[in-house]
Amino acid sequence: MGEKKMKKWVSMGLLACTTLLFAACSSGNKASKSTQETTKSTEVASGASKSGYADPKSLKNNYDVIIVGAGGAGMTAAIEAKDAGLNPVIFEKMPVAGGNTSKSSSGMNASGTKFQKAQGINDSNDAFYEETLKGGKGTNDKELLRYFVDHSAQAVDWLDQNGIKLDNLTITGGMSVKRTHRPSDGSAIGGYLVQGLLRNVAERKIPIFVNADVKDIKANDGVVNEVKVQIQGEKAKSIKGKAVIVTTGGYGASKKLIAKYRPDLKGYVTTNSKGTTGDGIALVEKLGGQIIDMDKVQIHPTVNQEKGILIGEAVRGEGAILVDDEGNRFVNEMDTRDKVSAAINALPKKRAYLIFDQGVRSRATAIEFYAKQGYVKEGKTVAELAKTIKVNQANLEQAVTSWNEAVANKQDTAFNRTTAMDHPLDTANYYAIQIAPGIHYSMGGVKINTNTEVLDKNNQPIKGLYVAGELVGGLHGDNRIGGNSVADIVIFGRQAGQQAAKFVSAQ
């Protein structure tokens, strides 16, 4: 399937970004009627179908590499392992593949890419490193971060070589230049990326078993090389490999873990898919893996509170502003997520409105999905919009006027915003989305080295065990920059597949 056909799936991928109910590693019971109905609807949404997944009857007793979790990191690792000549298998606990990757919105950060150069954007790995380190409050694992930025452009190239082109650029909070790569039409990256990875997995005939609950991971003779998996609720089976890669995502949907590590976040909605419950972290810890930073949970500032739907950072990156219930701006909208969230939580009702015009809507096409969900309020003029959302008309008009002056002068004297100031808000119609903060990402998890090898409590690698994606701890420090998660799963997913292949080949 070519890129042209893939693009036909992008709109469906947007739906997948919010309706897919999966994440990564271990679930359990036989599918109920409601689960079967959910599976059917999510397959339609994502472009996936039962025919695209492996028949449980085809399960073999042995594979070269066993991958637990079919999100972006897991599929990327599988592709690299296959291309290295190995025979990988993927086990996914949910009814469909994709995980939290399917819910990704803004894009993928990378520095010094060919797409940046083509648009005259001057960027460097060092700038990317320093801005990410600042965003993480200096607590990032510096070795992981250095590897991350230095391999980001290669990751964009690798995707492009595999028919997944990300040549439309925007910017996220905490970044100084446009380094957030997204699909050509400016749509959300999640559905597009998942479909591209699924296509590549299918072309290579890599089996993905869904409803496959990995109950345990074992080591034999000092090497991690076996899993116990239960497929579709049937009797669990032991499957042997030569290495295991765990890519099961974080714990942002686990009320139990959030209550344990961040009780202050009780009652917050979550943007995470339902399977993002930290299962893989527990499995790795049982094997002696070192677990770090579990109290570091990111709150995203712009979340729909009814369904926990993330309103992507690209909306602000294309020029939107935030106003309070009185219609006044109150924050630098392009500051880091922790600071913007704190500013919203300091408001009396702990909520705000994204305000934007038709120009922003045309550049950030993910907004069309939000509109279909009923989240977008509209007015032919700013005054009409103020009446619609019931904020002070004079204040909102002044907020927009002042912002447009700041854009014209390239100087925001009110809140010192310096990025995403390319376009004024002056093209009718005008729009608003009510938002508030929600649980979005877990920065804590498994400690690894730059080879994605899991480290034990003595910082020694556990042979045969690799980890990539959101269940890794340390890379993002105290706060993740928007667009770095997708980069993370591709960069370290590739590395996990490559390093596992080297390990297996050396045996």
Regions found by a protein language model. Give the residues of each.
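C-terminal motif of bacterial Sec signal peptides marking the signal peptidase cleavage site
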Residues: 21-24
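Helical element adjacent to the flavin cofactor pocket in flavoenzyme catalytic cores
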Residues: 185-242, 281, 287
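Glycine-rich loop(s) and the adjacent beta-strand/alpha-helix scaffold that form part
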Residues: 232-235, 239-302, 495
